[in-house]
């Protein structure tokens, strides 16, 4: 929680205004932010200075793990996070590759589970990583990436948190996640939950101990219509201690994550928070 608030204060005090063409808004911006999450000791990085809806964040990443490409599938898991980008993004609505209502195109999990080769075959990046880690193998290339410039025109949004690298040291698994751009008041709340949970899940299904998760952000920003709420409301609040995340121990394989797992298999214990803050979302 401390490192999150320090980043917010850094943006408010040191950030520079940058115009964002996609949204038509200005962003108070800093370059390079490093966050670290202690998964080994279950220090779940859930924002406490405003109420955080953690289930939607985990549901979204579960959708990525399953390779979903439709906002309706994400809604069925319990999150509406893709509704706007799939159905209200002007550029995507005009894109001839869009296949109708709720279609997201070849984004995020589609690339992770079915990266297309020139011959038309696909690569399941996640399956390869799980197989290797289960066998105790770290080839220094246990990398899951959603960033495929050759298919940006086939999706509604370029990935923000785009690459996840796993490192196995002995029987302890670590994760380094890379993010090109981060809406700190809204997006980071989700992203840090996802980084933590991804490592916890991967350690569980590969039979390894979870270590630390490292979260590297290039462009961290606060939109101009979010600044007042961040500066005058959220940063005035004192944080509560971090809660813990409980994951159903019956989740043992990638197939489990692909099939029967729901949000009922996750529980947060000891969560205290201040009142919600409704930050504007930029499509």
Swiss-Prot record:
Localization per Swiss-Prot or TrEMBL: Cytoplasm
- Gene3D superfamilies cross-referenced by the UniProt entry: Thymidylate synthase/dCMP hydroxymethylase domain (3.30.572.10)
An example Gene Ontology CC term for this record: cytosol
Q: Where does (6R)-5,10-methylene-5,6,7,8-tetrahydrofolate bind?
A: 183, 282
* Catalysed reactions, semicolon-separated: dUMP + (6R)-5,10-methylene-5,6,7,8-tetrahydrofolate = 7,8-dihydrofolate + dTMP
Q: Which residues bind dUMP?
A: 22, 180-183, 191, 221-223
Cite the GO molecular-function annotations of the record: thymidylate synthase activity
Question: Highest taxon of the source?
Answer: Bacteria
- Which residues are catalytic? 160 (nucleophile)
EC no. given is: 2.1.1.45
GO annotation (BP), single: dTMP biosynthetic process
- Matching Pfam families: Thymidylat_synt (PF00303)
Keywords annotated in UniProt: Cytoplasm, Methyltransferase, Nucleotide biosynthesis, Transferase
Report TM segments: none
Report the PROSITE patterns cross-referenced here: THYMIDYLATE_SYNTHASE
Q: Does the keyword rRNA-binding apply?
A: no
User: In which pathway is this protein known to take part?
Assistant: Pyrimidine metabolism; dTTP biosynthesis
* InterPro entries registered for this protein in UniProt: Thymidate_synth/dCMP_Mease, Thymidate_synth/dCMP_Mease_dom, Thymidate_synth/dCMP_Mease_sf, Thymidylate_synthase, Thymidylate_synthase_AS
Query: Quaternary arrangement and interactors, per the entry?
Result: Homodimer.
Give the family from UniProt.
Answer: Belongs to the thymidylate synthase family. Bacterial-type ThyA subfamily.
Matching entries from PANTHER family are given as: THYMIDYLATE SYNTHASE, THYMIDYLATE SYNTHASE 1
Role played? Catalyzes the reductive methylation of 2'-deoxyuridine-5'-monophosphate (dUMP) to 2'-deoxythymidine-5'-monophosphate (dTMP) while utilizing 5,10-methylenetetrahydrofolate (mTHF) as the methyl donor and reductant in the reaction, yielding dihydrofolate (DHF) as a by-product. This enzymatic reaction provides an intracellular de novo source of dTMP, an essential precursor for DNA biosynthesis.
Would you tell me the protein name for this molecule? Thymidylate synthase
